[in-house]
């Protein structure tokens, strides 16, 4: 049976998943690997059906050698699920920024890789790593077609007045406009929640909260992106792990003029030293909760404040709200943050079931039975969505 391999390359981890071409549901991966690079000793875990390994330490810190070692576990060892490499017919890659060039999956060639590279200045934390992952797997699987699936593509349905900045129009003509990100995750959650909702006559209005180290909201009407908090780059919008989110642009001009900061220093500070880390001393929300000091509490309060006001803005874009969804590492696991956010949005008709909110991490509804607005927690499955997008494009 033909199979599709998916790579989701991140700054501190690589996720690999293998699916058959008969993808039925998000839990249908035949094989999964998760490589963690952000520790002193890089490690990975493997999953094959219900069988899951303990962390296995890599014998190298080289990304290239580490991925090669893990990929070979597809056909070697206790977690092997294929006998020969040629059982894999397609490979899908997540790419964060597709700009105005890519609105659907695309077969990767030299020209596409050049375009992805040229867009790296707009997503410096992501596109270079995505491109590195593509080139690594191309060397391992040189005769297999590789496809790119873009996080920006889901937001192509935003209207002109939403994606256009109030700056000189000539800038827009040169491609400076709002693109939005986390589209693969937002699209996945919208599809999953559709299964929970009874058909209704009026358009279904969902706000999806993807809260991880990067964070964004998406206003979704009947499965289509209407508005989102990220923009030209993944720096706009909510407060994030190490990124500032939206700030007064006058601050940047002031710092360049009066603080003797170079463009490179300013870029680094806003991308790597701001957000939760800049205020609370760490980008890890679990540590923010654990520190219990003035700065960590301020960071948490700021995060929730910007989250709730962002949800309010997305509600205005939709003209109402039928459902709210939390996903991503923070969204799925931080019950306190969900509770505080929903309490402060009670005026919208959000009524949280506190007991359901505390439960495990499976997909679930966590609102009261009679809550006017339904609230969900969904474990995002970007790799499945990438595989499905590739197969739909091919057929």
Swiss-Prot record:
One of its GO terms (molecular function) is acetate kinase activity. It holds the Pfam family Acetate_kinase. Gene3D superfamilies: 3.30.420.40. PANTHER family: ACETATE KINASE, ACETATE KINASE-RELATED. Homodimer. It comes from the Bacteria. It catalyses: acetate + ATP = acetyl phosphate + ADP. GO terms for cellular component: cytoplasm. Substrate binds at residue 94. SUPFAM superfamilies: Actin-like ATPase domain. The keyword Electron transport does not apply. Its cofactor is Mg(2+); Mn(2+). CDD domains: ASKHA_NBD_AcK_PK. Its EC number is 2.7.2.1. Catalyzes the formation of acetyl phosphate from acetate and ATP. Can also catalyze the reverse reaction. The active site is at residue 151. Pathway: Metabolic intermediate biosynthesis; acetyl-CoA biosynthesis; acetyl-CoA from acetate: step 1/2. This is Acetate kinase. ATP binds at residues 15, 210-214, 284-286, 329-333. Belongs to the acetokinase family. GO terms for biological process: acetate metabolic process; acetyl-CoA biosynthetic process. Keywords: ATP-binding, Cytoplasm, Kinase, Magnesium, Metal-binding, Nucleotide-binding, Transferase. The lineage of its organism: Bacteria, Pseudomonadati, Chlamydiota, Chlamydiia, Parachlamydiales. Mg(2+) binds at residues 8, 382.
């Amino acid at each position: 049976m033909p199979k599709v391999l998916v790579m989701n390359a991140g700054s501190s981890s690589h996720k690999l998943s293998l699916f058959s071409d008969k993808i039925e549901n998000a839990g249908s991966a035949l094989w999964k690997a998760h490589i963690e690079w952000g520790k002193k000793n890089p490690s990975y875990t493997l999953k094959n059906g219900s069988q899951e390994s303990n962390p296995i330490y890599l014998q190298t810190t080289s990304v290239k050698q580490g991925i090669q070692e893990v990929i070979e576990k597809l056909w070697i060892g206790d977690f092997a699920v294929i006998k020969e490499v040629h059982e894999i017919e397609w490979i899908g890659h997540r790419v964060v920024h597709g700009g105005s060039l890519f609105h659907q999956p695309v077969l990767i060639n030299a020209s596409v890789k050049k375009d992805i590279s040229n867009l790296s200045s707009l997503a410096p934390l992501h596109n270079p790593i995505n491109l590195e992952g593509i080139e690594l797997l191309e060397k391992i699987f040189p005769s297999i077609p590789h496809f790119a699936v873009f996080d920006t593509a889901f937001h192509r349905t935003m209207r002109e007045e939403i994606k256009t900045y109030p700056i000189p129009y000539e800038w827009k003509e040169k491609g400076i406009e709002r693109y939005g990100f986390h589209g693969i995750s937002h699209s996945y959650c919208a599809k999953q929640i559709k299964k929970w909702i009874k058909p209704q006559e009026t358009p279904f209005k969902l706000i999806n909260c993807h809260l991880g180290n990067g964070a964004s909201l998406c206003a979704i009407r009947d499965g289509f992106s209407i508005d989102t908090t990220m923009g030209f780059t993944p720096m706009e919008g909510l407060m994030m792990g190490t990124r500032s989110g939206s700030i007064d642009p006058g601050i940047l001009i002031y710092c360049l003029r009066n603080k003797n900061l170079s463009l490179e220093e300013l870029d680094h500070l806003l991308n790597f030293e701001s957000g939760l880390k800049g205020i609370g001393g760490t980008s890890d929300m679990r540590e923010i909760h654990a520190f219990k000091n003035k700065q960590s509490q301020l960071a948490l309060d700021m995060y929730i404040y910007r989250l709730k006001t962002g949800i309010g803005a997305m509600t205005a874009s939709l003209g109402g709200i039928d459902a709210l969804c939390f996903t991503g590492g923070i969204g799925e696991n931080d019950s306190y943050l969900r509770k505080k956010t929903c309490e402060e949005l009670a005026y919208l008709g959000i009524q949280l079931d506190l007991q359901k909110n505390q439960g495990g991490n499976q997909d679930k509804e966590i609102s009261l039975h009679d809550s006017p607005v339904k609230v969900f927690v969904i474990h995002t499955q970007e790799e499945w969505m990438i595989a499905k997008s590739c197969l739909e494009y091919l057929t």
